[in-house]
Amino acid sequence: MQAKAVVRTVRIAPRKVRLVVDLIRGKQVGEAIAILNHTPKTASPVVEKVLKSAIANAEHNYEMDINNLVVEKVFVDEGPTLKRFRPRAMGRASQINKRTSHITVVVSEKKEG
C-alpha cells in the first residue's frame, strides 16, 4: 500500500529542490526527517512538511504503521515559471525566470524479508 502527498507551485527552483530530495529517497521516514532537519537548504523545511503530510495520510487513510514506512518515491517536477524583467544598462532589460516546483512524496510499508 502506498500513501502520497503533493505540494504544488513552491517558489524554489526544481534544480535546488532535487538536491534535497535525493538525500531522502529510499530511507526510512524517521531517518529522512532527521536528515532534513540537519540539511541547511531552503528547500528542506518544505520537503519535510510534504513528507510529514504523506506520513499522516498513510496513518489516517490507510492505517499503516508509521514505524514501518519507507520513502519509496520522491520526485520534483517543474511548475509554472514567473517571468520578470530586470533593468540593464543603456535602456535594455533582461528577462528573469522565477522557477517553481511541484514536489511529490510517496511512502509505503517496508516489505518483510
UniProtKB/Swiss-Prot annotation:
- Asked if Magnesium is a keyword of the record, the answer is no
| CDD domains linked to this entry | Ribosomal_L22
Q: Cite the entry's keywords alphabetically.
A: Ribonucleoprotein, Ribosomal protein, RNA-binding, rRNA-binding
Q: What InterPro entries does UniProt report for this protein, alphabetically?
A: Ribosomal_uL22, Ribosomal_uL22_bac/chlpt-type, Ribosomal_uL22_bac/org-type, Ribosomal_uL22_CS, Ribosomal_uL22_sf
**GO biological process entries:** translation
Matching PROSITE patterns, A to Z?
RIBOSOMAL_L22
Output the Gene Ontology terms for molecular function. rRNA binding; structural constituent of ribosome
**Gene Ontology annotations for the cellular component aspect, listed alphabetically:** cytosolic large ribosomal subunit
SUPFAM superfamilies for the chain: Ribosomal protein L22
Pfam family name, one: Ribosomal_L22
Similarity-based family: Belongs to the universal ribosomal protein uL22 family.
Its function? This protein binds specifically to 23S rRNA; its binding is stimulated by other ribosomal proteins, e.g. L4, L17, and L20. It is important during the early stages of 50S assembly. It makes multiple contacts with different domains of the 23S rRNA in the assembled 50S subunit and ribosome.
Which HAMAP family does the entry mention? Ribosomal_uL22_B
Quaternary structure note: Part of the 50S ribosomal subunit.
The protein here is known as: Large ribosomal subunit protein uL22
Q: Please state the gene responsible for encoding this protein.
A: rplV
